[in-house]
């Protein structure tokens, strides 16, 4: 094998491939809620149900069942505290039917007092106009005494929501 052939072969294998596989949701969300540790299983269920009932279906009247009053919010679009949370999400519209599952849910991880839900996120492709690609979005919660005490996600500042 010539030096040129070796160099070309190495260059081929060293070149990054940009054909990422699409992110796909978990086929069995009930399995994601399981844990050998009862506390972790309870924390997963709390975060999952909060997401289904309060965030997705906007049953804001049930927020106190899941959240502490002094809830800490790290999303730059919503205020800290349950009152600020409700004020922000009330702008998105009224309650909707509560689904049995969360659309696009990929995984639920729990460790200590933290639970992370990750989701499929479809985005406009900036390189290929008119096309979409998938990536991952997440919401992380800190649980304190059986209620959500703190929240993080990957949100950036947005225009004020409207109904």
Located regions from the model:
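C-terminal and inter-domain tail/linker signature
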Residues: 19-163
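Bacterial N-terminal signal peptides that target proteins for export
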Residues: 1-7
């Amino acid at each position: 094998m010539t030096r040129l052939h070796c160099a070309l072969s190495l260059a081929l294998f060293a070149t990054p491939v940009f054909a990422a596989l699409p992110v796909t949701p978990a086929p069995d969300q009930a399995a994601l809620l399981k844990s050998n540790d009862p506390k972790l299983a309870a924390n997963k269920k709390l975060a999952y149900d909060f997401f289904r009932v309060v965030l997705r279906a906007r049953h804001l009247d049930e927020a106190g069942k899941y959240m502490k009053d002094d809830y800490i919010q790290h999303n730059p679009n919503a205020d800290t505290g349950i009152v600020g949370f409700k004020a922000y999400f009330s702008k998105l519209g009224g309650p909707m039917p509560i689904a049995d599952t969360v659309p696009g849910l990929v995984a639920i991880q729990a460790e200590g007092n933290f639970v992370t839900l990750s989701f499929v996120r479809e985005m406009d492709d900036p390189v290929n106009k008119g096309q979409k690609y998938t990536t991952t979005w997440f919401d992380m919660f800190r649980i304190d005494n059986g209620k959500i005490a703190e929240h993080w996600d990957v949100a950036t500042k947005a225009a004020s929501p409207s109904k």
